[in-house]
Amino acid sequence: LVGSEMCIRDRSLTCSYCANFHKNVYPELKKNFIDEGIISIEYKSFPLNIAALNASKFAHCENDGNSELLHFLYDNQNEWAKGSTAEEYNKNLIKVIKSGNFKIDEQKCLENKSLEDHILNDRIEGVKSFNINSTPTLLINGKKFEKSLTYKNLKKAIEKLL
């Protein structure tokens, strides 16, 4: 499994279960498997709504998927993932990103059509290739991980492949 890829398709940044995974499971996974070079992780976008799509745009736009911004967005999800219109979501999102001192050109990110296409194509690929219909969904070596996304379950699955 050394160098094997685990693909996390939990990038609906408005998904509370995804935020929980990112905050409570990912750190142990990173420490014990990613940092040790046993697995690598590739994030794919699977936005469930316009707020998640725009958050994904910011995470990729000038940061190329910068994990620091990704962590920040998950950690502050309750502050920005609220509103009844796209404008409200965007206003909250921009306010939270600025509070973290990230340097982002908001309009450039929001209006980036090729980036939007890339993010939406990740979602389409997930549906077509892996029958993904919800978040979080995790793939290990191209196969859906069907158990509860706890560190214990993931550790057991990874160790079984070693």
Question: Where in the sequence are the language-model features?
Answer:
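Short, small-residue-biased leader/transition segments that mark boundaries at the very start
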Residues: 1-8
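A broad, low-specificity signal for short, low-complexity segments enriched in glycine/proline
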Residues: 5, 18-21, 96-101
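Sequence contexts marking disulfide-bonded cysteines in secreted/extracellular proteins
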Residues: 8, 16-19, 62
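Short pre-active-site segment immediately N-terminal to redox-active cysteine/selenocysteine motifs
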Residues: 11-17, 47, 134
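Typically the conserved alpha-helix immediately C-terminal to a functionally engaged Cys/Sec
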Residues: 19-34
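A generic structural motif
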Residues: 37-39
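General small-molecule cofactor/ligand-binding pocket signal
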Residues: 42-44
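Cysteine-centric redox/oxidoreductase cores and disulfide-bonded domains
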Residues: 47-135, 139-152, 156-162
